Amino acid sequence: MGTFHSVFSRILRVEAERIGYSQNFTIYDDADQKSLIKAIIKELGLNDKVYKPSTVASRINMAKNNIITPDDYANDRAIMTRDFETHMPDVAKVYKAYSERCRMANAMDFDDLLTNTYLLLQENPDVLEKYATAFEYILVDEYQDTNAVQQKIVALLASRHNRICAVGDDAQSIYAFRGANIDNMLGFETAFKGTKVFKLEQNYRSTKRIVAAANSLIRHNMRQIKKDVFSENDEGEKLLLNMAYSDKEEASIVCSEIKRTMKKQGCDYNEFAILYRTNAQSRSFEEALRKSSMPYKIYGGMSFYQRKEIKAVIAYFRLVATPD
């Protein structure tokens, strides 16, 4: 049991020599990848203000997730047109140099763990037979988040026994920007003949109002697996939607709502919780809470102002402001 990356890395450790790597290959993390790309951009004499390492890395990763090699990338008219229109016509050169450097260093990045596993199985029938036979039953969770190469690998591994169970919800597909392909879910019955579909339509977590609101939005999807989601919980309170034009305005609205509720219902601060999706969003809320003199505590993360680098900058400013 494991993630796609962990399971495939174990397979590659055993079979690495079949694709030209040694078994002790290094796995580059995101920082390693961007550092190497940055160096290549500099060596090629490209403008790093235009060719930002994070942007180039994103395009390379997307290509790998769709099994597009450096040569395929350079010969794809649609891709090259897009790169030209965004003033980055030489991404193909960076991609090719990056791939060559990784192989020379006996290194793979996270997306290589996927593409190299696919190539290993696709080009070596004996290796495919070995693992397709070993994996009698395959269970994949959150199938709506799988990308093109993951789907192809799953199909190869399931080719021997044809016993695969995929769990997912097409209505929760939100990672297309990372390469997730909703067609994997919508086309599952076509890709795997004899599929039986079990719809889990009862929502045990949310109130009836929340489920009804979700259904009213999802029903507008042109392509979907039809479902009639329902809840047997309480009706629940009416939903409230506040539109904000910036992160600062959003934080200000939240603080105002806290004040309003406290005044109306006599609540304490410890009865409120602010949920945000990423740690980077904490800053705007912290600034608004501090400005409103509201006490708060960060759970499961670190306050923006407690981060080492931020404390160092603040300490420097204090020194400049009060040198004595």
Regions found by a protein language model. Name each.
Residues 29-32, 82-187, 199-206:
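Conserved helicase NTPase motor core
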Residues 3-6, 168-171, 178-182, 202-204, ...:
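A short beta-strand-to-loop transition that corresponds to the Sensor-1 phosphate-sensing loop
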